[in-house]
């Protein structure tokens, strides 16, 4: 199997000067030029924001963009002091998971998929939007539709990937809504672990105890968690398999 999930133009390399105002990061390129890049990840990015760390950015030539550069990856050291590249663009997670679904890499858990739709309204008030709504193939024994919520996961402690890394009211609401879909539908929470050094996944109780409680309640009700791990490179991302819960 070709484990390259996505390929793209080689990213531009530099070092992080600072991240500020949540959405912005100043980066010094190899040429010596300093540019400001958009940071799509507005969270605290625990364990990642080391000034002077190697980073990678993409460039857009769209005239509609205020900032042509987007911060995509940062290099950190794992527990063995080896370099690990981490994908920090939260908007990229859904692209990865859509590719994973389309390649049938989750079929042993969710079955064969007939159709994939994105951003479909759901919930009691229909004011929320699910990341992916899937219909099963007619050959599937389980005929239930599948709702998938995706969470970008970058925080690691002791080789355990953790989400969230801060209190997330939105994430709590998503767990409640996923639980309410059971048993009529299949509820799936995909943890998109955008680094290769995770061996397990667990909810980030230290950052958000309520989220951890809701996660376990939803799990007991039948929600399916799928921690998907990836390896990030300068011009592609590789599939690194599904990690167990801790």
UniProtKB/Swiss-Prot annotation:
Pfam families of this UniProt entry? SfsA, SfsA_N
* Top-level taxon in the UniProt lineage: Bacteria
Q: Write down the CDD domains for this protein, in alphabetical order.
A: SfsA-like_bacterial (cd22359)
- Any GO molecular function: DNA binding
What is stated as this protein's family in its record? Belongs to the SfsA family.
The record's section on NCBIfam families has: sfsA (TIGR00230)
This protein's name: Sugar fermentation stimulation protein homolog
Gene giving rise to this polypeptide? sfsA
